[in-house]
Structure formats: C-alpha cells, structure tokens
C-alpha cells in the first residue's frame, strides 16, 4: 500500500463520502479501486455497462474471482446477455447497492467507464418508463424489414427534434427514440427534461477521471486484447454466439464480440478479428475522453500513477 493510499484510509471514511473512479478502458481503474477498498473498508460498485453481463467476464475485463474475494464487489456479472439492461435499471440496482454499503458502514466506490451511469449518479436520469416488449419487437421488426433509413423517417414524423439530433445511421438510438415516442406518446427529449434526482449530488462525492497518455493507453489496449484471447475470450464469444441472440442487444455489441463472431464463422482470420477489436476499443477510449471532458467537467483528471495521491489530497 502506498503512503497516499494509507492516508486515504484515515481521511475518506470519516467524511462518509462516495468515491467515483472513471476513465477510459484499460486505464487502471480497477486496481486503484481495489487498493482503496482494502485500505478504507470499501465496496466496489460496477459502473460499466458491459461488465454487468455474466456472459463476458474475460472480454469485458471484469475483476477476477481472486480480486472479488478480497473486497465486496457489486453489480458485476449479474445480468444475462439476453437482457437489454437500461441505464434506468442500473440506477435502480446502484441505489440498492449504495444503501447496502452505507447500512454496513462501507465506503461506496463506483468504478467504470460508462459516462451515462456516472451522469445519472450525480445529475439524475430521465424518467422514461419501461417499454412494452410488444412495442420493442414491432420497432425491431420494422428496422430489419425497412432498414434504418425508413425507421429514421418514421421517427422524423413522430419526433422531429430527436430525429434531427440523432445520427440517421445509428440503428440502436433511432430505434430507441421511436420506441419511446410510440410507447408513451412523448418524445425522448421531453422525457429527458423530467430527470429523476441524482443518487449522489456532486458535493457528496470525490470524483476522478484517470487520464493516461494516449500512446501508452492504446498500447495497453492492444496488449490486453491479446491477453483476453489467450485467457478464453474466444470461447466466451462462441458460447454467446451459440445462443443466437438479437445482434442489437448491448452484450452482442461489446467491443470484440462482432469481430470474433465473424472469425468463428470463417469470414476473417483471428489476427484480423483481434485488429478490429483493438481498433474499436481504441476508438471507444477516445470517445470516453471527449464525453467526460464535455459532459462531466466536475471530474478531476489525473494521471493514473498520481491518482492515489490526489484522492488523499481531495479527502484529507
């Protein structure tokens, strides 16, 4: 344990604060959270939209069973890949995990890379109700039959504001916006105006964004993807593909899954699949930098090797 981490053990619990550790994929978030949880008597609460799925432990870099045995972990691998797990569902689960942590006197440490989840924690989330399965199935069928252009045209007729805001080629977001307006009679924009209150107001949290040097991060991403393949990621994807799930489900679009499925079908080589998976992950990391910079400026950016020291300074 570093001196700074040792100091955090004294500083943070006295204040009863929650700690938020965000950052791009492969930036060292989990290691920092584990050290902090061990030092402070904390519980690590997953704040990553892909690590909720039980089918993809290796490919989503979930904590190992050994790490999970060291400190309490919550919301990891609890959702089946067949479920379209929404941000609203995550907030509900996170609220229960937060209440449990506080009831047991544990420091809540939210860790992950999903910006929308962190925004919901500190800013609140729109109160869009659950969409009836029949509506969702109807929209998906129209998407498959007519394509995204026809679906976007339908959205433009029902909800021109959302249609103008969305990329017309973004199948998932266009379908989601049309589902909402057809199921509720209100546009997604209207629902976003009626946000639910935040679970953790900004003044109650210590929030860091781990920001490695880009070239170092991209090298880590490439190396880690190869290690994932060696650790059984391809077997995970084969088992997932055998279930023949809707390709639009979030788990089916996890970084690396589509390319590895193409490899399993004999369409591309293993090396080509790995190259695509690495490139997709690097692009995602770049988007994470941009998203947090513009959407959550209250997060303090820090180099990973200075994060423990910075946490101590913020809370001490």
UniProtKB/Swiss-Prot annotation:
Residues 48-51 are annotated as: Interaction with substrate tRNA. GO terms for molecular function: ATP binding; tRNA dimethylallyltransferase activity. The record marks 114, 136 as: Interaction with substrate tRNA. One of its GO terms (biological process) is tRNA modification. Its EC number is 2.5.1.75. ATP binds at residues 23-30. InterPro entries: Dimethylallyltransferase, IPT, P-loop_NTPase. It catalyses: adenosine(37) in tRNA + dimethylallyl diphosphate = N(6)-dimethylallyladenosine(37) in tRNA + diphosphate. It is an enzyme of class 2 (transferase). Keywords: ATP-binding, Magnesium, Nucleotide-binding, Transferase, tRNA processing. SUPFAM superfamilies: P-loop containing nucleoside triphosphate hydrolases. The keyword Ribosomal protein does not apply. Substrate binds at residues 25-30. Pfam families: IPPT. Its cofactor is Mg(2+). Monomer. Belongs to the IPP transferase family. Catalyzes the transfer of a dimethylallyl group onto the adenine at position 37 in tRNAs that read codons beginning with uridine, leading to the formation of N6-(dimethylallyl)adenosine (i(6)A). PANTHER family: TRNA DIMETHYLALLYLTRANSFERASE. This is tRNA dimethylallyltransferase. The lineage of its organism: Bacteria, Pseudomonadati, Pseudomonadota, Alphaproteobacteria, Hyphomicrobiales.
């Amino acid at each position: 344990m570093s001196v700074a981490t040792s100091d955090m053990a004294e500083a943070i619990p006295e204040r009863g604060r929650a700690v938020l550790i965000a950052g791009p994929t492969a930036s060292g978030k989990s290691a920092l959270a584990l050290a902090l949880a061990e030092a402070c008597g904390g519980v690590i609460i997953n704040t990553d939209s892909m690590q909720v799925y039980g089918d993809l432990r290796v490919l989503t870099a979930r904590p190992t069973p050994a790490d999970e045995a060291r400190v309490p972990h919550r919301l990891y691998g609890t959702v089946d890949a067949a479920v379209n797990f929404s941000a609203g569902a995550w907030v509900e689960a996170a609220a229960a995990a937060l209440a449990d942590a506080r009831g047991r006197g544990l420091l809540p440490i939210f860790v992950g890379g999903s910006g929308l989840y962190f925004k919901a924690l500190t800013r609140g989330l729109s109160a869009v109700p659950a969409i009836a399965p029949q509506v969702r199935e109807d929209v998906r069928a129209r998407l498959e039959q007519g394509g995204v252009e026809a679906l976007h045209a339908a959205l433009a007729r029902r909800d021109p504001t959302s249609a103008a805001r969305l990329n017309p080629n973004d199948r998932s977001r266009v379908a989601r916006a049309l589902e909402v307006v057809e199921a509720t009679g209100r546009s997604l924009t209207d629902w976003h105006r009626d946000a639910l209150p935040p679970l953790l107001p900004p003044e109650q949290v210590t929030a860091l964004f781990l920001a490695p040097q880009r070239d170092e991060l991209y090298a880590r991403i490439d190396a880690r993807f190869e290690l994932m393949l060696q650790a059984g990621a391809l077997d995970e994807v084969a088992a997932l593909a055998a279930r023949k799930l809707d390709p639009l489900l979030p788990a089916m679009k996890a970084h690396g899954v589509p390319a590895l499925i193409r490899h399993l079908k004999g369409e591309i080589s293993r090396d080509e699949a790995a190259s695509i998976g690495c490139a997709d992950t690097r692009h995602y990391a770049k988007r994470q930098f941009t998203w947090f910079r513009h959407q959550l400026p209250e997060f303090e950016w820090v180099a990973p090797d200075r994060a423990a020291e910075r946490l101590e300074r913020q809370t001490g």
